[in-house]
Amino acid sequence: MKINGVKGMNDVLPADVARWHEMEAVAREVFALYGYREVRTPAVEHAALFARGVGEATDIVNKEMYVFEDKGEELLALRPEGTAGTVRAFIEHGAFVEGPQKWFYMGPMFRRERPQKGRYRQFHQIGCEAFGVAEPYLDAEQIALLADYFARLGVTAELKLNSVGDAQCRPAYLADLKAYLVANQGALCADCKDRIERNPLRVLDCKVESCQPVLEQAPRLLERLCEPCRAHFDQVKAGLDALGVAYRVEPRLVRGLDYYVRTAYEFTSDALGSQSAVAGGGRYDRLVETLGGPPTPGIGFALGEERLSMILEKVGRAAPERRPAVFFVSADATGALEALRLAAGLRRAGIACELDPRGGKLKAQFKQAERVGARWAVVLGGNEVATGQAKLKDLQTREETPVALSELAARVSG
């Protein structure tokens, strides 16, 4: 009986992995320009980390997190997002004593949500976290980093910006919002009704069409910001203006995690047919303290690799895949052995090459050479080995020229 993959867990095949390599390589290049260093944290953490850090009232913790008991009866979880684990590592290893830190991560996350195009139960994120700086110009710089990253990949994305306030101004707003939503809950969908008590701010993020008239008239947090939050938001916008990063203020933009304060932002793209989020982030000035560390401001973002890969494919960006320079076509056993030896030498010289150990008909081997995208084909048999000369075929121009086997590396390395 055939065993298929688990529902919602997606295979990324070699043709697509090449695009992922590019996304990750460009991320490393751009992040390094801004001073971010890579951190790697486990996929498994204590479930309490996310309950406390992400928020027990969130859909992620309430409905979507994979939680299990190990043999020691500890309650563990597959990480549903990357920030909490990165903050835990920042605290556990005492990185805060070294002053401000900029870290980035890449890896799989897990949420048991309904699988759909571009969304899987195992998905991959690239994220940045900056610790130790409360000033708003860091917010602008990090957003500019993400804008630079998308530009390098040739992706057009719109920046949506908002402030979600803080502990000083948000509670009074949430009370007003909750009262408004309760008064109008008859016009809201079931999910929105459920969130009114648990997480009323998330109701504003609902995409259900029938909810929109109510949400359009909902109280706006931007109009209720305290003076420090308003000043912070104004300086973030000034920083983005100075950096030449275009943005649109979106009063209904909220983040799905409880730890966000002040700056919240998303990059969206319509490349997949509708305005869908490609990346999102914001400020979390109390999270380090909430998880047991000293008071430390922070800001971070995450982007989804699956969705970004789909966008790159949609806009026609070819996945850069390294092809072999040379394919050895073996005419007989003597030629196959010599191909093995020559291939080893070319690889030591940094030249990619392939051969078919099965040998077989020359026509079939030439077809394989074209299938793998080789630039050159070299036919080897007993006669070529004896004379030290072979024919070098350019598979693009179809021209054949003689080549001394001792000079093969020089001929194909250009």
Curated annotation (Swiss-Prot):
SUPFAM superfamilies: Class II aaRS ABD-related (SSF52954), Class II aaRS and biotin synthetases (SSF55681)
Reactions listed under catalytic activity: tRNA(His) + L-histidine + ATP = L-histidyl-tRNA(His) + AMP + diphosphate + H(+)
InterPro entries: aa-tRNA-synth_II, aa-tRNA-synth_II/BPL/LPL, Anticodon-bd, Anticodon-bd_dom_sf, His-tRNA-ligase, HisRS-like_core, HisRS/HisZ, HisRS_anticodon
A Pfam family it matches: tRNA-synt_His
Record GO cellular component, one term: cytoplasm
Enzyme class: ligase
Quaternary data: Homodimer.
Protein name: Histidine--tRNA ligase
